[in-house]
Amino acid sequence: PYTTLFRSSPELQNLIVAYSKSLYESPYRAYLEEKIGPVAFKNIELSLKGFDEKLIPLMQEENALTTEYKNLLASAKIEWEGEILNLSLMKKHMNSQDRDTRKRAWEKHTNFFVENAEKFDELYDKLVKNRTAQAKELGYENYIELGYYRMQRNCYDKDMVKCFRDQVKKYLVPFAEKLHDRRRQRLGLDKLAYYDAGMFFNNGNPAPIGTPEE
């Protein structure tokens, strides 16, 4: 079953890392880099920094928690005008041309998370503690550095991302505020609300046309 395979994936990853390590430490490394490129070996280096066999039990627990989280999201059954919809199907109504419909849809969507807040909080707390424990096992201060290795961020680090965040705040946020104000005027509203976030035109947003076959 998928769940069994997912829980076993850290053990499979252990085999992949062992194979990658043999390539990384190969006496033919220079030749291999010439053939498949240095980026592949940089990624191997990151994968070696982000994994150790002793982490397998913690990684299996992490997989179980993320699966539980996804299952909780998938369990949503929202009553909407005689239908039972999941979170994805509610998106259509959350972007309805009618503002009152949007508001009601957003409230229904939000209520699912409010009603399950305790379970979401519990899963989040367990995941944070699990990932922090993994980072500590590898000698890192917290999960940030380990997370970058696992995402294979091979050309930038957390300090560069902080610089980018600062630039977004300085340059993009003021620009975005102007765009949102233009959108508010176009929609004829005194003030934008959270349920207006996905609306751009009074006559509705552009929608796909045609059939899947086309």
Where are these regions (language model features)?
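A well-structured
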Residues: 1-159, 163-210
